[in-house]
């Protein structure tokens, strides 16, 4: 549910009298590679809404900074500001956008409640949104043996384990430094600790991956129904019908994340769930999807480089001017390039012609 702000925060404008919802600026605080943020940004793109976006870097712990915790006491992205309204949590933001922008020029992603398609879209949206994506993400990093062709580098396992300890210490320190946010920081610390205990449990991970397969079986069956309902000369359908809906937003972003994590080959391809495979290939060609999420092979490099620039900007002493900034950027850029080159090298080796001795 949207809440009102008593004063301007983060540069958010108060609603001006006489202005329509469409005329009031939308401001989104997000992280480009956050799963929840991607769903919201895809909805904004599909609805062709104008929105001012601010990247809140999770690797740099910007979501734990006091200014952001005052926007959202859970310290999680995304957060949407629309005039005096502050809306947190992806599902609530998406519902707010769908219920607020009702003019004829703005595409609707949810059928009318009286429509035969409404319960179908709502069912698959709720089913897909209930998947524990944070557990899949942390789990594949902590236990890469459960994945195949994961695009997350091996060093990340050690890195995330050390970062967990650092984050707990950081939250404790922030709680002491900001008495007004003490409860919020302590609550976040407890949630983090509880989640990561589960996410580091192999038995739990195997259980939720088995449950994921059952969900994807339902999706595969639904996609097959769409194919059977559609005449040969008809338009190719989406998950719940001819239109791209909120159920498709959830499914498209989920499949893209599973591909990045290394769970794609386990769930589709090589004759397994062919409708799901065809659906994902079609989604990749969708203009709005490419604009928001891009190619799966570019996710790692597009996460590293902006973070490198932010680190350089934050740490560079002003007295030394641009020389140090350029140096830091070059160093961090080189680090990102080396990560990219390592993956590219393996691709080149695979394509290199083998000598023929016969």
UniProtKB/Swiss-Prot annotation:
InterPro entries (UniProt xref): Glutathione-S-Trfase_C-like (IPR010987), Glutathione-S-Trfase_C_sf (IPR036282), Glutathione_S-Trfase (IPR040079), Glutathione_S-Trfase_N (IPR004045), GST_C_GDAP1 (IPR034336), Thioredoxin-like_sf (IPR036249)
Keywords linked to the UniProt accession: Acetylation, Coiled coil, Cytoplasm, Isopeptide bond, Membrane, Mitochondrion, Mitochondrion outer membrane, Transmembrane, Transmembrane helix, Ubl conjugation
Gene3D superfamilies: 1.20.1050.10, Glutaredoxin
TM helices/strands, residue ranges: 292-312, 320-340
Similarity field: Belongs to the GST superfamily.
Domain of life: Eukaryota
Pfam families: GST_C_2 (PF13410), GST_N_3 (PF13417)
Topology relative to the membrane: Multi-pass membrane protein
Native organism: Bos taurus
Protein name: Ganglioside-induced differentiation-associated protein 1
Role of this protein: Regulates the mitochondrial network by promoting mitochondrial fission.
Region described as Required for mitochondrial localization: 320-358
GO-annotated cellular components: cytosol; mitochondrial outer membrane
Subunit field text: Homodimer.
Domain GST N-terminal residues, every copy: 24-105
Cross-link Glycyl lysine isopeptide (Lys-Gly) (interchain with G-Cter in ubiquitin): residue positions: 50, 172-173, 188, 190, 203, 206-207, 214
Post-translational modification: Ubiquitinated by PRKN during mitophagy, leading to its degradation and enhancement of mitophagy. Deubiquitinated by USP30.
GO biological process, one term: mitochondrial fusion
PANTHER family: GANGLIOSIDE-INDUCED DIFFERENTIATION-ASSOCIATED PROTEIN 1, GDAP1, ISOFORM A
Protein localization: Mitochondrion outer membrane; Cytoplasm
Modified-residue entries (N6-acetyllysine), positions: 203
Annotated SUPFAM superfamilies: GST C-terminal domain-like, Thioredoxin-like
Domain GST C-terminal: 153-309
